[in-house]
From Swiss-Prot:
Residue positions binding [4Fe-4S] cluster 1: C76, C80, C83
Protein name: FeMo cofactor biosynthesis protein NifB
Pathway: Cofactor biosynthesis; Fe-Mo cofactor biosynthesis
Pfam families reported for this sequence: Nitro_FeMo-Co, Radical_SAM
Enzyme Commission number(s) from the entry: 4.-.-.-
Cofactor(s) essential for the protein: [4Fe-4S] cluster
Ranges for domain Radical SAM core: 62-311
Binding site for S-adenosyl-L-methionine: Y82, G130, T182, I234
Keywords assigned: 4Fe-4S, Iron, Iron-sulfur, Lyase, Metal-binding, Nitrogen fixation, Plasmid, S-adenosyl-L-methionine
Length: 493
């Protein structure tokens, strides 16, 4: 028997840690291992301790925990053809974009304010809008201030890797536990198509020479991080016709050098963003092309499939950016940190994630044991917590799962414009949603109206709210059983 539903949304909307814990305890916990680590059986305990509350390094954790980025590092030492940094932009959702640059003191003020209001917060990252290692003094000063005030928060940086080797020892000394390196090539001939120039050793390099230096520094930095036990995630931008097939080789190289995760992301090439690739017509991959590459990389370095390509000032759960709520004009001038609400939230999560893991593993095993050749591509509307708990019309993205002979796995997400605006459905938005759901067999959501349901059906996509508020994997297992006539894994409520 599973635990009664505890709504994470209602918990995080409470005003005090006491209310949060009272709500959690009223829900109870039926799992015999309530409060344990929920560690996957295929992972050692030391690694699990590092990732269990890091939403970017753990697909399971991203259902429960939030990250925030502080824009303290605007300077950059390379130019990428897919990047155009903007420092006062509120309406673009992509890396390299922020609403405002921060000093280390302003960053501390903002982090404390967010930690007091967002109990899911577990990670502070510096991801630009330039490069965290090149703009090192600001990165270091920010981490030192935050670690002194909120010692339990995980510290994380994202870097292009060019200046990484000279700072690895200091990163280890400051207990920076996770580092992301963007590596798009291991062949300089490919790299020169992506990077017009780099700035290294007080001079500018171009062409193959630039790409060769960048490659060597990236590999050295990765090896140094691995040797010091710092977990690394490799980000790669999939650029059709430039490096798409080459990323298979990149995956091999980074796995050999100890990368924990490889995150292959689609190129964002909207001309309105002003990037070189966008302005010259270089297209990004569609969702099916990205999935095909992900499938080819199975068996190599472990893949991250839940990346949202966040802004450099993102705040909140992945897929739910609350950054505009916490610009400097919205946060107190001198906030005082109170960790009680964050601690209470962690106790809540400990009560429910074991139940989720038990249901998830049972569902995956049930689908795999059915040994059915067919597969289902399922899009899910969710607010987090591992449940189908979002109204179709309110969804800003759909998480995509595949049920097949190997079980159930998360394979990506599709961003959309919400169908409902002010209580009314928008036909243009629905057309965009249907296009975004290309290749999907069925949509699972908490609620859906007859009109969008019928329009989806006309496009060959079924939708149902039958499994509303069930755990995602358990619902997919039950759905799979219905589709293929096998014994179901009972969906949990």
């Amino acid at each position: 028997m599973s635990a009664p539903i505890i709504s994470l949304e209602s918990l995080t909307n409470t005003t005090s840690s006491g209310q949060l814990l009272t709500t959690a305890k009223s829900g109870g916990c039926a799992s015999s291992s309530c409060g344990s680590s929920s560690r996957p059986t295929d992972m050692d305990s030391a690694t699990w301790e590092k990732i269990k509350d890091h939403p970017c390094f753990s697909e399971e954790a991203h259902h429960y925990f939030a990250r925030m980025h502080v824009a303290v590092a605007p300077a950059c030492n390379i130019q990428c053809n897919y990047c155009n940094r903007k420092y006062d932009c509120a309406n673009e959702s992509r890396p390299g974009v922020v609403s405002e640059k921060l000093t280390p003191d302003q960053a501390l003020r903002k982090v404390v304010a967010v930690a007091n209001e967002v109990p899911q917060l577990s990670v502070l990252g510096i991801a630009g809008p330039g490069d965290a290692c090149y703009d090192w003094n600001k990165t270091r000063a920010t981490f030192e201030r935050v670690a002194s005030e909120i010692p339990d928060i995980k510290l994380c940086i994202s870097t292009n890797g060019l200046a990484l080797p000279e700072h690895v020892d200091k990163l280890a000394e400051m207990n920076v536990s996770h580092v992301t390196i963007t590596i798009n090539m291991v062949d300089p001939a490919v790299g020169e198509k992506i990077y017009p120039w780099i700035f290294y050793g007080h001079r500018r390099y171009t062409g193959v020479d630039a790409a060769k230096i960048l490659h060597e520094q990236q590999m050295l930095g990765l090896e140094m991080l691995t040797a010091r036990g710092i977990l690394t995630k490799i980000n790669s931008v999939m650029i059709p016709g430039v490096n798409d097939l080459h990323l298979i080789e990149v995956n091999k190289w980074v796995k050999e050098r100890g990368a924990f995760l490889h995150n292959v992301m689609p190129l964002i090439s909207d001309p309105a963003h002003g990037t070189s690739f966008g302005l010259t017509g270089q297209r990004g991959p569609n969702a099916l092309e990205l999935k095909a590459l992900h499938d080819r990389l199975e068996g190599g370095a472990k893949l991250m499939r839940h990346c949202r390509q966040c802004r450099a000032d993102a705040v909140g759960l992945l897929g739910t950016d609350r950054g505009q709520e916490f610009t400097l004009d919205h946060v107190p001038l001198e906030p005082h940190y109170d960790g009680a609400k964050r601690q209470a939230y962690r106790e809540v999560v400990a009560r429910i994630r074991d139940d989720h893991l038990e249901a998830k593993e049972k569902a995956i095993a049930t689908v795999a044991s059915a040994n059915i050749r067919g597969s289902l591509q399922v899009a899910v509307a969710t607010k987090g917590g591992g449940r189908i708990n979002e109204h179709f019309g309110h969804a800003k993205e759909f998480q995509v799962y595949e049920a097949s002979q190997t079980g159930i796995k998360f394979v990506g997400h599709r961003k959309v414009e919400p169908y409902c605006h002010g209580g009314w459905g928008e036909d243009a938005a629905l057309a965009g949603i249907i296009a975004a759901l290309d290749g999907i067999d069925i949509v699972l959501c908490a609620r859906i109206g007859d009109c969008p349901k019928e329009r989806l059906m006309e496009a060959g996509i079924r939708a149902t709210d039958t499994y509303g508020y069930d755990y995602i994997e358990a619902a997919i297992s039950a759905l799979h059983a219905t589709e293929f006539g096998t014994a179901p894994s009972q969906a949990t409520a």
